[in-house]
Regions:
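Charged, glycine-rich intrinsically disordered N-terminal tails and low-complexity linkers that flank
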Residues: 1-72
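Catalytic cores of nuclease domains that cleave nucleic-acid phosphodiester backbones
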Residues: 58-163
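A short, sequence-level motif marking secondary-structure junctions
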Residues: 26-29, 146-147, 216-221
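Metal-dependent nuclease catalytic regions and adjoining charged, substrate-binding loops involved
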Residues: 168-237
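Secondary-structure junction/capping motif
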Residues: 20-24, 88-91, 169
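A structure-centric signal for secondary-structure junctions around beta-strands
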Residues: 6-8, 15, 67, 127, ...
Length: 237
């Protein structure tokens, strides 16, 4: 593999040149308005009548719990996809995935889990949760377990140029992420993207299931981002 991932540091490296590649998550983050943790934690602390440190510690605890949960659920799905192993207590969750991918994952499908994708030209890399190949058509799917999933931005925030026509929210962020994966997979294989899907973890009446959210392949936006990155990289060299 010409690019490797250090799972502890989450750094992608070109194995031949030693050059570090920008992760897809970091790349997208460069076009987002950063969250002002200091400002908002002070406001929340004042509103709730507690110290700022209490709010920051609370947020940190919530983040850690969510990350652990996400890691566990991803492992459950990875074990099923790779080995058809269903972990005890997750039968309903896996069953909801099977039913919702029935028309895409076929008996003769090529299934790739945790597939590392990259582009040497633009020096970026990322890992797709699931790639499904049916002959010359492929589908990319991603599991999301975060608590918040918005389709709009209530503060009317948008991404930075050159994608400043897109609202800054979870749905758009993930759509861009999967679109970049699709673009890289097209370049690596010559195959065509048949669809992108987010599987969002939901709970209702003590039942856990996947909500299937189709995404549009935003190829032109991906090209805009990549060309902008390349231009900025050139200016910095």
């Amino acid at each position: 593999m010409p690019v490797k991932l250090d799972h502890e540091t989450h750094v992608y490296t070109n194995t031949e040149t030693g050059e570090k590649y920008t992760s897809v998550t970091t790349l997208i983050g460069n076009y987002k308005k950063p969250f002002d943790k200091d400002k908002w934690s002070k406001l929340v602390a004042k509103r709730e009548g507690v110290s700022q440190d209490e709010i920051l510690n609370k947020w940190s605890s919530i983040t850690t719990t969510a990350q652990n949960r996400g890691t566990n659920v991803h492992l459950v799905m990875e074990n099923y996809i790779k080995d058809k192993k269903i972990e005890q207590g997750y039968e309903e969750l896996v069953d909801s995935f099977i039913k919702k991918t029935n028309g895409v994952i076929l008996p003769n499908s090529k299934i790739l889990s945790e597939e590392l994708l990259f582009t040497h030209e633009f020096k970026i890399a990322g890992t797709a949760d699931l790639v499904v190949e049916n002959n010359n058509i492929f589908y990319i799917m991603d599991f999301k377990t975060n608590k918040k999933f918005n389709f709009i931005n209530k503060y009317n925030d948008y991404f930075y140029e050159p994608i400043d026509y897109l609202p800054q929210c979870e749905f758009t962020t993930y759509t861009i992420q999967l679109s970049i994966y699709a673009w890289m997979y097209e370049q690596l294989t010559g195959k065509k993207c048949g669809g992108l899907k987010i599987f969002y973890l939901r709970e209702f009446n003590d039942k856990t299931f996947w909500q299937e959210i189709p995404c549009t392949y935003m190829k032109s936006s991906v090209v805009d981002i990549l060309n902008d990155k390349k231009l900025k990289d050139t200016k910095h060299t």
